[in-house]
């Protein structure tokens, strides 16, 4: 074998690679030559070429595999294989170069990568398998974000795969992948690549890092250009009833907030690479505050973290963007976070927002509650009425009162201050007078309607002529009755158009409105039948009359005891009586069909029984001619058994007397004995169960009445009857006077009253004391929301009390050592400054 020098070999290498062994990664992939036998080693440091005559069992020294085991991705060795053909030699006369000369030659080792091999490497946290990935991508002019390296179903990239396979919170392939993407000019595309399937669409590596609670990876991704505004809007991230998923507001900032990661929240808002927009909205218009309200579930732990995170984000927003009113931003439904909390029944979050009081001077303008004075457990507070009162669209009162019956804690939310006192103030000032007046008018209307119906003409067909003086009064009463029916009809139409209640809400919350609407329908039907010359107008009229007197219960809302009693009646009708009637009708119809099948008219007319002949003896008495061979008559007869007035021998026209008696006895046992007594027991249990609930429901019904009355006013009248006063509570971040419409509430709190000792005036409850010290114009009053003029709140009092707390020296209090006696001097209390350490 002729040996060539390394210089000669190097000179011959390039033309050989170009002409005889082209690079398999260049050119059309379909025209590539088949690869050589794959190497069995994944090591890159040493590669051996086995020439003719070498043993097939020879493996590289560092090969970890056994014979017959193949890598999923082979290593292709492309080397300048030089053959020498002597003149006269045949095809078998070719000679391979010696191994020494081959080892000295220039070799080029490349490993082919596909999606499967890369995914396996990153899932196993194996950086060694990715050492040749950069060379492969550069040679093939490909990128990690190409479709061939993505999951065809989900669009998952190798970076997303690595983020999902962390080992002890780390995956060393992630920095390697980012560096490879940087050198292939695809870093931004790889970092921001997201899922493409409909289920996880939009989720990026940053979302996964936040969900995995990994601050280091979040920092790494943001440093490398991760989009902090990327929205994950797949089906899994939408709030769909009955489907698994987690709604967090789509954005990375919202995800960090909803998973209680304050550190990541602060990093996203304050990092030096790309800061998140705190006012950004998702596809439904929700901000990060809306998202926090959505994830609240009214449990103690959840409410604690949600309110804490809500407060931190609100204060961060005030510090980063002083003029931004983050809490006033609305979603696509026009709801603020406060209104959303009310509409979804998040009572813990609602109470926190309504009663939020912040002490920090730079964030004090975020407070909605301002304590004016405190004396022991009693303190007077001013509540901001913005977004609460009905003067604004989507106010909290309207959202709670007009929300669906399926809204949790709907009745309890009205007990949260200041909502409870605000509704009571509206009722006391003007609503109750209007309500009582309407009650008197309705009573007068029903009396007129009753008189017109009672003195209706009996002879002839309608319409009737007016011949006497009394007829004019009767017609006047009829006209007034019809006008009342028309009014109730259009009021019902307006109610249904505005509220659009569901079927369940219609029978639960719209109970009275539906009865008034039915009353109006019967009245209008009466008018149509009357002028159609049909005497059947009387049937429709009496139904309207009966419903009219029944609807008198609506006005029991103005009286607490009667209102609670009416609520109990309504609940028993809708819960217990409806279920009883369903089962009873089934029994009644079933046994009636069985009994009527046994009855045959005229079966025993010729042979009257002894009891029958004795019952009807006498010349003037004859057996009744009524027939029970009809379902209607049999149902009426069986109904008598239900109320204990039935007769087992109400007829003799039947076959199989034993079967007949057994059917009647079974019916009596199931209805009169079982169902009726069960109904009584259920009603008693319902009364005990919903005693407190009925009071809350009555308050809700009265709240609806208050709001309906207020909405019936003109806009100018609404402002005149508005509760509260316009007050200056401090200063806005830009230095302007902060005026708010506030409502005053005096409260007693025995839990935290000892923490308010610094918030005290010389004359608590006497506004003149504040006037003397701060030159504010006040009026002495303790009545909530009434009889007090505009005055500036006392933030200076808080600052003064804070200075007092800072200047006060803490003292240690201890007793004299017990000496065994019970003399008064043994109870002497000693005080000393804590700093001195003397005892």
UniProtKB/Swiss-Prot annotation:
ANK repeats, residue ranges: 111-139, 154-186, 204-229, 250-277, 286-322, 336-359, 394-416
Binding site for Na(+) 1: 644
Extracellular topology ranges: 456-472, 533-535, 599-630, 653-656
GO BP terms: behavioral response to pain; calcium ion import across plasma membrane; calcium ion transmembrane transport; cell surface receptor signaling pathway; cellular response to acidic pH; cellular response to alkaloid; cellular response to ATP; cellular response to heat
Modified residues (Phosphoserine): 117, 502, 775, 801, 821
Impact after mutating residue 550 to A: Abolishes response to inhibitor SB-366791
Effect on the protein of changing residue 693 to A: Abolishes response to inhibitor SB-366791
Tissue occurrence: Widely expressed at low levels. Expression is elevated in dorsal root ganglia. In skin, expressed in cutaneous sensory nerve fibers, mast cells, epidermal keratinocytes, dermal blood vessels, the inner root sheet and the infundibulum of hair follicles, differentiated sebocytes, sweat gland ducts, and the secretory portion of eccrine sweat glands (at protein level).
Post-translational modification comment from the UniProt entry: Phosphorylation by PKA reverses capsaicin-induced dephosphorylation at multiple sites, probably including Ser-117 as a major phosphorylation site. Phosphorylation by CAMKII seems to regulate binding to vanilloids. Phosphorylated and modulated by PRKCE, PRKCM and probably PRKCZ. Dephosphorylation by calcineurin seems to lead to receptor desensitization and phosphorylation by CAMKII recovers activity.
Chain positions with Phosphothreonine modification: 145, 371, 705
TM ranges: 434-455, 473-497, 511-532, 536-556, 560-598, 657-683
Residues binding Na(+) 2, per UniProt: 644
Sequence ranges marked intramembrane in UniProt: 631-652
Catalysed transformations (reactions): Ca(2+)(in) = Ca(2+)(out); Mg(2+)(in) = Mg(2+)(out); Na(+)(in) = Na(+)(out); K(+)(in) = K(+)(out)
Membrane topology per record: Multi-pass membrane protein
SUPFAM superfamilies: Ankyrin repeat
Amino-acid positions noted as binding ATP in the UniProt annotation, renumbered to this chain: 116, 156, 161, 165, 200-203, 211-212
Additional observations: Responses evoked by low pH and heat, and capsaicin can be antagonized by capsazepine.
Full protein name: Transient receptor potential cation channel subfamily V member 1
């Amino acid at each position: 074998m002729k040996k060539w020098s390394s210089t000669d070999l190097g000179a011959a290498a390039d033309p050989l690679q170009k002409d005889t062994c082209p690079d398999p990664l260049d050119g059309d992939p379909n025209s590539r030559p088949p690869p050589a036998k794959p190497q069995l080693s994944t090591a890159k440091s040493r590669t051996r070429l086995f020439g003719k005559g070498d043993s097939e069992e020879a493996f590289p020294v560092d090969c970890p595999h056994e014979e017959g085991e193949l890598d999923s991705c082979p290593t292709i060795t492309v080397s300048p294989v030089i053959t020498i053909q002597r003149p006269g030699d045949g095809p078998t006369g070719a000679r391979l170069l010696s191994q020494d000369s081959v080892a000295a030659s220039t070799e080029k080792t490349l490993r082919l990568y596909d999606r499967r091999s890369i995914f396996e490497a990153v899932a196993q946290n194996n950086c060694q398998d990715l050492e040749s990935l950069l060379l492969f991508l550069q040679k093939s002019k490909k990128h990690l974000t190409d479709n061939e390296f993505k999951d065809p179903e989900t669009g998952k990239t190798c970076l997303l795969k690595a983020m999902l396979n962390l080992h002890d919170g780390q995956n060393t392939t992630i920095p390697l992948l980012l560096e490879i993407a940087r050198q292939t000019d695809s870093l931004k595309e790889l970092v921001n690549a997201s899922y493409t399937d409909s289920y996880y669409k939009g989720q990026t590596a940053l979302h996964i890092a936040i969900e995995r609670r990994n601050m280091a990876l979040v920092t790494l991704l943001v440093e490398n250009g991760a989009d902090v505004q990327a929205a994950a809007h797949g089906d899994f991230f939408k709030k769909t009833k009955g489907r698994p998923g987690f709604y967090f507001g789509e954005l990375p900032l919202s995800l960090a907030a909803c998973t209680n990661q304050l550190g990541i929240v602060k990093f996203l808002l304050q990092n030096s690479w790309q800061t998140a927009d705190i006012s950004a909205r998702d596809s439904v218009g929700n901000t990060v505050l809306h998202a926090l309200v959505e994830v609240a579930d009214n449990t103690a732990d959840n409410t604690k973290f949600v309110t804490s995170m809500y407060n931190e984000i609100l204060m961060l927003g005030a510090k980063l963007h002083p003029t931004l009113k983050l809490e006033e931003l609305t979603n696509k439904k026009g709801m603020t976070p406060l209104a959303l909390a009310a509409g979804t029944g998040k009572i813990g979050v609602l109470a926190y927002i309504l009663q939020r009081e912040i002490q920090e001077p730079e964030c004090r303008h975020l407070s909605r509650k301002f304590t004016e004075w405190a004396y022991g457990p009693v303190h007077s507070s001013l509540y901001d009425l913005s977004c609460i009162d009905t003067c604004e669209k989507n106010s909290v009162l309207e959202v709670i009162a007009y929300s669906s019956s399926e809204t949790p804690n709907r009745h309890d939310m009205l007990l949260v201050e200041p909502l409870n006192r605000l509704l009571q103030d509206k009722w006391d000032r003007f609503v109750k007078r209007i309500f009582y007046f309407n009650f008197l008018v309705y009573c007068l209307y029903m009396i007129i309607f009753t008189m017109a119906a009672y003195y209706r003409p009996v002879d002839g067909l309608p319409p009737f002529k007016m011949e006497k003086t009394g007829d004019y009064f009767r017609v006047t009463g009829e006209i007034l009755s019809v006008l009342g029916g028309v009014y109730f009809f259009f009021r019902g139409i307006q109610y249904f158009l505005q509220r659009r209640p569901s079927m369940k809400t219609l029978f639960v919350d719209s109970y009275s409105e539906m009865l008034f609407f039915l009353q109006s329908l019967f009245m209008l039907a009466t008018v149509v039948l009357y002028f159609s010359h049909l005497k059947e107008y009387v049937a429709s009229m009496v139904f309207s009359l009966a419903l009219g007197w029944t609807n008198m219960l609506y006005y029991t809302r103005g009286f607490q005891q009667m209102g609670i009693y009416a609520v109990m009646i309504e609940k028993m009708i809708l819960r217990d009586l409806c279920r009883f009637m369903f089962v009873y009708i089934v029994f009644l119809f079933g046994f009636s069909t069985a009994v009527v099948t046994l009855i045959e008219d005229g079966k025993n007319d010729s042979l009257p029984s002894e009891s029958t002949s004795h019952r009807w003896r006498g010349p003037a008495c004859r057996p009744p001619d009524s027939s029970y061979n009809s379902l209607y008559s049999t149902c009426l007869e069986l109904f008598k058994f239900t109320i204990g007035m039935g007769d087992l021998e109400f007829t003799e026209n039947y076959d199989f007397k034993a079967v007949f008696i057994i059917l009647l006895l079974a019916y009596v046992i199931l209805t009169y004995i079982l169902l009726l007594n069960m109904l009584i027991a259920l009603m008693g249990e319902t009364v005990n169960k919903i005693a407190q609930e009925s009071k809350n429901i009555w308050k809700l019904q009265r709240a609806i009445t208050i709001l309906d009355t207020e909405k019936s006013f003109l806009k100018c009248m609404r402002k005149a009857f508005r509760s509260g006063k316009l007050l200056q509570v401090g200063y806005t971040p830009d230095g302007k006077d902060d005026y708010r419409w506030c409502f005053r509430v005096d409260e007693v709190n025995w839990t935290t009253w000892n923490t308010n000792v610094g918030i005290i005036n010389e004359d608590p409850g006497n506004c003149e004391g504040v006037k003397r010290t701060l030159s504010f114009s006040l009026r002495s009053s303790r009545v909530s929301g009434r009889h007090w003029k505009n005055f500036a709140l006392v933030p200076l009092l808080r600052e003064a009390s804070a200075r007092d707390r800072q200047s006060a020296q803490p003292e240690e209090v201890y007793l004299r050592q017990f000496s065994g006696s019970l003399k008064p001097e043994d109870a002497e209390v000693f005080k000393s400054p804590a700093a001195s350490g003397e005892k």
